[in-house]
């Protein structure tokens, strides 16, 4: 079911991140950041919460959290979280996006939430917000 899919995703993403780290082995890679839109945002959030690699920052645009497996990493990470969601999103309703971000907030993650009037879309304003977040 979904738990098996999450476990397979975590295994695959661990390998992907490790491959990127190995590829850039001559540089000091100490800050891995993730971001995504919709299901990509959900994937970024799930990996941040459950993955084995340390994530420095993560941004979610119109994201949500799927049903999560029982085993989870320790709470109170210093991973910075940016959550952007739209009040007019008909695909990922704002309450689902808020729930995902509240889950991180309740675990002690530093979080910045931006609520907009956008629908289920990635806007130029979102890209500017991402740039500012990752460059701060």
Where are these regions (language model features)?
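Serine-hydrolase catalytic machinery in alpha/beta-hydrolase-like enzymes
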Residues: 1-27
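Alpha/beta-hydrolase-fold catalytic nucleophile elbow
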Residues: 35, 59-62, 84, 116-117
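C-terminal catalytic histidine-bearing segment of alpha/beta-hydrolase fold enzymes
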Residues: 82, 95-136
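Gly/Ala-rich beta-loop-alpha elbow adjacent to hydrolase catalytic centers
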Residues: 35-40, 44
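Active-site signature of alpha/beta-hydrolase-fold catalytic machinery across serine-
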Residues: 46-50
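A conserved short beta-strand
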Residues: 53-66
């Amino acid at each position: 079911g979904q738990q098996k899919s999450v476990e397979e995703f975590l295994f695959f993403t661990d390998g992907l991140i490790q491959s990127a780290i190995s590829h850039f082995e001559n540089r000091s890679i100490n800050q891995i950041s993730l971001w995504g839109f919709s299901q990509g945002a959900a994937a970024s959030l799930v990996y941040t919460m459950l993955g084995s690699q340390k994530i420095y920052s993560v941004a979610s645009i119109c994201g949500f959290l799927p049903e999560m497996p029982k085993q989870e990493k320790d709470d109170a990470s210093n991973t910075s979280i940016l959550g952007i969601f739209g009040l007019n999103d008909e695909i990922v309703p704002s309450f689902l996006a808020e729930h995902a971000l509240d889950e991180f907030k309740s675990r002690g993650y530093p979080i910045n939430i931006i609520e907009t009037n956008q629908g289920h879309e990635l806007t130029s304003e979102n890209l500017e917000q991402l740039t500012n977040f990752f460059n701060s």
